[in-house]
A protein has these predicted regions:
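Non-transmembrane, aqueous-exposed alpha-helical and coiled segments at domain scale
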Residues: 1-107, 203
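C-terminal binding/interaction regions
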Residues: 40, 46-54, 61-64, 75, ...
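Short, well-ordered loop/turn sites that connect or cap secondary structure elements
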Residues: 124-127, 133
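Feature captures the catalytic cores and cofactor-binding loops of soluble hydro-lyases/lyases
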Residues: 5-46, 141-273
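Short, solvent-exposed amphipathic alpha-helical segments in soluble enzyme
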Residues: 69-73, 86-88, 129, 149-152, ...
Length: 301
């Protein structure tokens, strides 16, 4: 039932205009206001809108049966409804590309270009939370399977097949290229899965920074601060666009892991945001906290 309710149209604003007519509708509004007043915002970076709607379906059942479902505002919210009436195949006409705005490349004057090939610890520690960086040069990749193998090799005292000292690693498993592509879609994966590896990898390899998606947990943040490293956030949900910044790609280690092998990317102006700086300041903590105070002070929720 919880999942079924998420297929209903977004209509919370209509409900707010006409007012609730039942306890369930009252509860929808209460939860909607309470969650948005937290100031969590899009991608957890702070803002007025955290949820777009709250759905509630009730049915006589045991008191312990309280299913809750959440749907992210991504591809999962796009649905097509059609009827199979036996007259033939149900063909879906692709919308015209003209319905979308043109993609523009304007990062603004405040973005800082970073040369990964000459990166120093001092430069890493100068990055500020929320700052936009444009990465250029050689970047390595590695996600779950690669990290597990790296840590296992370190624990056995073995030499890694690739030198991570002074490098930046991107949490990604790129899709295989097609036609004239250098690499397929290469969007960041959720970074918290690498949290348990972070301290050991930073300490024993000399890695400078990591690039991934979403927030880092307390263990990773403490490790980043301890080792004066940084965590950079790439744009989630834009894997194809991120791949346009990758100018060359080759596998350099753990080829048997397929897409989770360690790749060497050469990137050009790859946009990222400083999400955790060398002092352990996380924008996923400061952003929501700042917006929660704004909402409380100005009653703008």
């Amino acid at each position: 039932m919880a999942k079924e309710s998420l297929m209903d149209p977004i209509d919370i604003h209509e409900l707010r205009e006409r007012g609730p007519k039942s306890r369930a509708e009252e509860l929808r509004l209460e939860i909607f206001e309470a969650v948005n007043n937290l100031g969590i915002g899009a991608q957890g970076l702070g803002g007025l809108t955290t949820v777009l709607d709250i759905k509630i379906k009730d049915y006589p059942t045991h008191a312990a049966s309280k299913p809750v479902a959440m749907i992210p505002n991504c591809a999962a919210t796009r649905h097509v409804h059609f009827v199979l009436d036996g007259s033939g195949p149900a063909l879906q006409k692709a919308p015209s590309i003209d319905q979308w705005p043109d993609i523009t490349w304007d990062v603004g004057p405040s973005a800082r270009r970073v040369n990964l090939d000459t990166l120093t610890r001092d430069e890493v520690t100068s990055w500020k939370p929320g700052e936009t960086l444009l990465l250029n040069g050689v970047m390595l990749t590695g996600r779950d399977a690669a990290h597990q193998r790296i840590v296992a090799m370190l624990n056995r005292g073995e030499t890694l097949p690739v030198d991570l000292s002074g490098k930046v690693i991107y949490y990604v498993g790129p899709v295989d290229p097609v036609r004239d592509e250098v690499v397929g879609p290469a969007g960041p994966t959720t970074s918290t899965r690498m949290d348990k590896f972070t301290d050991q990898v930073l300490e024993q390899t000399g890695l400078f920074a990591m690039v991934g998606k979403a927030e880092r947990g307390p263990v990773a943040i403490e490790a980043i601060k301890k080792h004066q490293a940084a965590y950079l956030m790439a744009v989630g949900g834009a894997a194809y666009l991120v791949a346009q910044a990758i100018k060359s790609s080759r596998i350099i280690a753990f080829e048997d892991l397929g897409m989770e092998a360690i790749h060497e990317f050469v990137v050009e102006d790859m946009p990222v945001t400083v999400a955790v700086d060398a002092e352990g300041t996380s924008v996923h903590q400061t952003g929501p906290a700042e917006w929660a105070q704004k909402i409380l002070a100005k009653n703008i929720g």
